[in-house]
Regions:
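Alpha/beta enzyme core
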Residues: 1-253, 267, 271, 307-337
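Extracellular/luminal recognition modules and glycoprotein regions
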Residues: 298-307
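A SIS-like phosphosugar-recognition module
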Residues: 192, 260-261
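Short acidic/histidine-rich active-site segments
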Residues: 254-259
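Polybasic, proline/glycine-rich intrinsically disordered low-complexity segments
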Residues: 276-287
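Acidic, glycine-enriched catalytic cores built around paired aspartates
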Residues: 291-292
């Protein structure tokens, strides 16, 4: 029903993810909990049917997996036979082998290959995956999603690293050769630090002298114009191109960049405006003059608020008696350059 409402409102693409809905976290935070594949695939099918019922045969479904950083599941998957999808999901659980005599009241037990296994269950009643299984789970998530109606996949990673992304996409494309990846160039990453560390580690492996750099302090402004800093910036500037060329990224997106631009510009304006050195010049030089030079329409903020449209309405209904805002005394005329 929600998907249909979104489509009716104009959505041509819908992204869904494999986290539980009631305890969902940001994809770059800890404490993520995933659902078994049967639950996730049911959602994909529901979205596809919503598109089809509304007469849209080419609606886009993006299936996102948060499994790389998710160490928990809310439930054990239903499995009917060894090797089925539920059994594969459960195979990643952190279990201990026990005997029938070791069973305790309320224990949840899995039988696999003739063994009794007790999954590690937390006080929250969530079950824990084995450490180091994130990439394997991501690959399985993506393959099954594409096989069951998704058009594109989205893997949420903990760092922007072309090699890591490529390794997973290559495995997916072994099964789905035309798999297309959506990637989030997220502000949640510290891009400067990540790429400086990548350069530092690469140079170390190559035997290059890195004694001039402190790996634990690579965010220092002292390195902004250094050879390492410049090399990291080159890698950042080519990340999208490299990701598409080598890691199968079909669509690059960036989440909430305007949140950060608004915060930074407001902070800078406040500091300058209330300083003795700049005062009003902070706004004029840093904002208004640049709006004029770059032809930003918002410099005429009255127009952007609809004053010209209001004048049209006034003139239509009142004719010559209309009191229009766009007369010669309107200061907005100062921007008609």
């Amino acid at each position: 029903l929600l998907a249909k409402k979104m489509i009716e409102a104009g959505a041509c693409a819908i992204q869904i993810e494999n986290q539980v809905s009631d305890e969902k976290q940001c994809g770059h935070q800890d404490g993520k909990v995933t659902v078994p594949h049967s639950d996730f695939l049911a959602k994909i099918n529901a979205v596809r049917y919503a598109f089809l019922e509304l007469g849209i045969p080419n609606g886009i479904i993006v299936a996102r997996t948060d499994s790389l950083g998710a160490g928990l599941t809310k439930q054990i998957a239903v499995t009917n036979e060894p090797g089925d999808l539920g059994d594969q999901y459960n195979s990643y659980l952190d279990c201990e082998e026990i005997s029938a005599e070791e069973l305790k009241n309320g224990d949840v037990i899995i039988k696999r290959e003739g063994k009794l296994l007790r999954p590690k269950r937390l006080a929250s009643n969530l079950f824990q995956f084995r450490a180091g299984t994130g990439e394997d789970r991501c690959v399985l998530d993506c393959i099954t999603s594409l096989q069951n109606g998704a058009d594109m996949i989205w893997i949420e990673t903990e760092k922007p690293h072309v090699g890591q992304i490529k390794a997973m996409v290559d495995r997916i494309r072994d099964v789905i050769p035309n798999a297309k990846l959506v990637y989030n160039n997220s502000p949640s990453f510290n891009w400067t630090l990540n790429f400086r560390q990548q350069v530092f580690d690469k140079w170390t492996e190559e035997g290059k002298d890195t004694s001039a750099y402190d790996r634990d302090n690579l965010m220092s402004a002292d390195y902004d114009d250094s050879e390492l800093g410049n090399e990291a910036d080159k890698m950042i500037s080519s990340f999208q191109k490299d990701g598409s060329a080598h890691a199968g990224i079909f669509h690059h997106l960036i989440t909430l960049p305007t949140y950060h631009t608004a915060a930074l510009s407001t902070d800078n304006l406040a500091k300058g405006y209330f300083s003795r050195e700049e005062s009003m010049l902070a706004y004029v030089k840093g904002i208004q003059r640049e709006e004029i030079r770059q032809g930003i329409a918002c410099v005429k903020h009255q127009n952007m608020a609809g004053s010209d449209i209001g004048d049209n309405h006034k003139e239509y209904f009142a004719g010559d008696a209309a009191l229009k805002a766009s007369g010669e005394d309107n200061t907005m005329n100062q921007f008609n350059l």
